[in-house]
Amino acid sequence: MALVTDFLNFLGTTWSKYSVYTHSYAGNYGPTLKHAKKVSAQGKTAGQTLRQRSVQDKKPGTYSLADVASHDRPGDCWMIVKEKVYDISRFADDHPGGTVISTYFGRDGTDVFATFHPPAAWKQLNDYYIGDLAREEPLDELLKDYRDMRAEFVREGLFKSSKAWFLLQTLINAALFAASIATICYDKSYWAIVLSASLMGLFVQQCGWLAHDFLHQQVFENRTANSFFGYLFGNCVLGFSVSWWRTKHNIHHTAPNECDEQYTPLDEDIDTLPIIAWSKEILATVESKRILRVLQYQHYMILPLLFMARYSWTFGSLLFTFNPDLSTTKGLIEKGTVAFHYAWFSWAAFHILPGVAKPLAWMVATELVAGLLLGFVFTLSHNGKEVYNESKDFVRAQVITTRNTKRGWFNDWFTGGLDTQIEHHLFPTMPRHNYPKIAPQVEALCKKHGLEYDNVSVVGASVAVVKALKEIADEASIRLHAH
């Protein structure tokens, strides 16, 4: 019973305080994440409380954008939220969302704060208030329109989910699982194994989308309930550490396709050297001829690499899960739920199928199919889009790095709603079944402010990705043969 209580407390209040990273900075562009270290997930220390009071006791001042921008370092970091200035220097290391907060040191964090935080977090801001922002010029019209649009969507109830809709998705997933298992129960041939593994891979992909929904707080108003089902679908079904995923995914949402000043990726989703370079600027950081030899063929390698995506993610997740720095409760929860995944997966294979070769074939094929199906959707969403290393506001950063694919009932389901990826990046806590309702308004917003609303067919998106990879591969070939 004590373990259950610990688990619920962990989900509700301390799920994301797994690690805080030390950073190396390049100008104002944010952190390069390097070394993990354990941070206590308990309450504030007396020293922290005193430091917090010292912030509160200061007489509020008036600050310019330049004043705020000068406080952009660990230990000396300010942030703007709704035209007010906050000194978060003593809070940043204990931020429940982890290191993602560092991507907005010295910047206006209004939109990212509103996007990712519950109402209770707004009250906590008062503890760090030091003054008001004095703008030398009016707020960017794009940001003003975006904030007005978000407020309108809230009034219209578009951030409230249909529980019946999510129940239906869960039942569809259960049917996929049952069909996969029934196939190999009925027929033990290799053809049946391929069919069953394909269905199981599709099941894993679709459970990935459900985990994504829950962990973005799209389904329930209660964050603990969302976290519980996130762990169920994430750790238990997919076998991925939820906390590992949250750490990298939060940074992806706040800094999509962003690099530091030296073009080292901050967004781990484009940190794929030495196998893939997603921009010529990233390629320019490569000096090794051996790596250039690989990169000149990257447009041919992308499809085979997608098959291996699950293995890459699994490796990263397991390194995180079995990190000895995890505290006892957290480590037990992560290890136990991930171990449960491998237990049922292995049991299904070896209990149903005879021998060793056939169970292993089924397990490997499932992983390959799941990797392809997940990776294919991710690749179409952001790859081949702009990669940048200068500070951008939240809205522009999301739109210029993101691509939609043409909607249809199958694409909506297959991609887990990520065919409306632009809408998801602008409003990640909105239930995905509402994205089609807001798409025309988002497209109009982009058109009004001269931003490309990239919405192409799946084939068109695939061609765009391969074309971008080939252009970079050609550059790698030129550099290689020029040496």
From Swiss-Prot:
<feature type="short sequence motif" description="Histidine box-2">
    <location>
        <begin position="249"/>
        <end position="253"/>
    </location>
</feature>
<keyword id="KW-0275">Fatty acid biosynthesis</keyword>
<feature type="domain" description="Cytochrome b5 heme-binding">
    <location>
        <begin position="60"/>
        <end position="134"/>
    </location>
</feature>
<keyword id="KW-1133">Transmembrane helix</keyword>
<feature type="short sequence motif" description="Histidine box-3">
    <location>
        <begin position="421"/>
        <end position="425"/>
    </location>
</feature>
<dbReference type="GO" id="GO:0046872">
    <property type="term" value="F:metal ion binding"/>
</dbReference>
<feature type="transmembrane region" description="Helical">
    <location>
        <begin position="337"/>
        <end position="357"/>
    </location>
</feature>
<keyword id="KW-0408">Iron</keyword>
<feature type="short sequence motif" description="Histidine box-1">
    <location>
        <begin position="212"/>
        <end position="216"/>
    </location>
</feature>
<keyword id="KW-0349">Heme</keyword>
<dbReference type="InterPro" id="IPR036400">
    <property type="entry name" value="Cyt_B5-like_heme/steroid_sf"/>
</dbReference>
<keyword id="KW-0479">Metal-binding</keyword>
<protein>
    <recommendedName>
        <fullName>Bifunctional delta 6-fatty acyl acetylenase/desaturase</fullName>
        <ecNumber>1.14.19.38</ecNumber>
        <ecNumber>1.14.19.47</ecNumber>
    </recommendedName>
</protein>
<feature type="binding site" description="axial binding residue">
    <location>
        <position position="117"/>
    </location>
    <ligand>
        <name>heme</name>
    </ligand>
</feature>
<dbReference type="GO" id="GO:0102865">
    <property type="term" value="F:delta6-acyl-lipid desaturase activity"/>
</dbReference>
<keyword id="KW-0444">Lipid biosynthesis</keyword>
<feature type="transmembrane region" description="Helical">
    <location>
        <begin position="302"/>
        <end position="322"/>
    </location>
</feature>
<feature type="transmembrane region" description="Helical">
    <location>
        <begin position="191"/>
        <end position="211"/>
    </location>
</feature>
<feature type="transmembrane region" description="Helical">
    <location>
        <begin position="164"/>
        <end position="184"/>
    </location>
</feature>
<comment type="function">
    <text>Fatty acid acetylenase able to introduce a delta(6)-triple bond into gamma-linolenic and stearidonic acid. Also able to introduce a delta(6)-double bond into delta(9)-unsaturated fatty-acid substrates.</text>
</comment>
<keyword id="KW-0560">Oxidoreductase</keyword>
<keyword id="KW-0472">Membrane</keyword>
<dbReference type="Pfam" id="PF00487">
    <property type="entry name" value="FA_desaturase"/>
</dbReference>
<keyword id="KW-0276">Fatty acid metabolism</keyword>
<feature type="transmembrane region" description="Helical">
    <location>
        <begin position="360"/>
        <end position="380"/>
    </location>
</feature>
<dbReference type="Pfam" id="PF00173">
    <property type="entry name" value="Cyt-b5"/>
</dbReference>
<keyword id="KW-0812">Transmembrane</keyword>
<dbReference type="GO" id="GO:0016020">
    <property type="term" value="C:membrane"/>
</dbReference>
<feature type="binding site" description="axial binding residue">
    <location>
        <position position="95"/>
    </location>
    <ligand>
        <name>heme</name>
    </ligand>
</feature>
<feature type="transmembrane region" description="Helical">
    <location>
        <begin position="225"/>
        <end position="245"/>
    </location>
</feature>
<keyword id="KW-0443">Lipid metabolism</keyword>
<dbReference type="InterPro" id="IPR005804">
    <property type="entry name" value="FA_desaturase_dom"/>
</dbReference>
<comment type="pathway">
    <text>Lipid metabolism; polyunsaturated fatty acid biosynthesis.</text>
</comment>
<comment type="similarity">
    <text>Belongs to the fatty acid desaturase type 1 family.</text>
</comment>
<dbReference type="InterPro" id="IPR001199">
    <property type="entry name" value="Cyt_B5-like_heme/steroid-bd"/>
</dbReference>
<dbReference type="InterPro" id="IPR012171">
    <property type="entry name" value="Fatty_acid_desaturase"/>
</dbReference>
<dbReference type="GO" id="GO:0006636">
    <property type="term" value="P:unsaturated fatty acid biosynthetic process"/>
</dbReference>
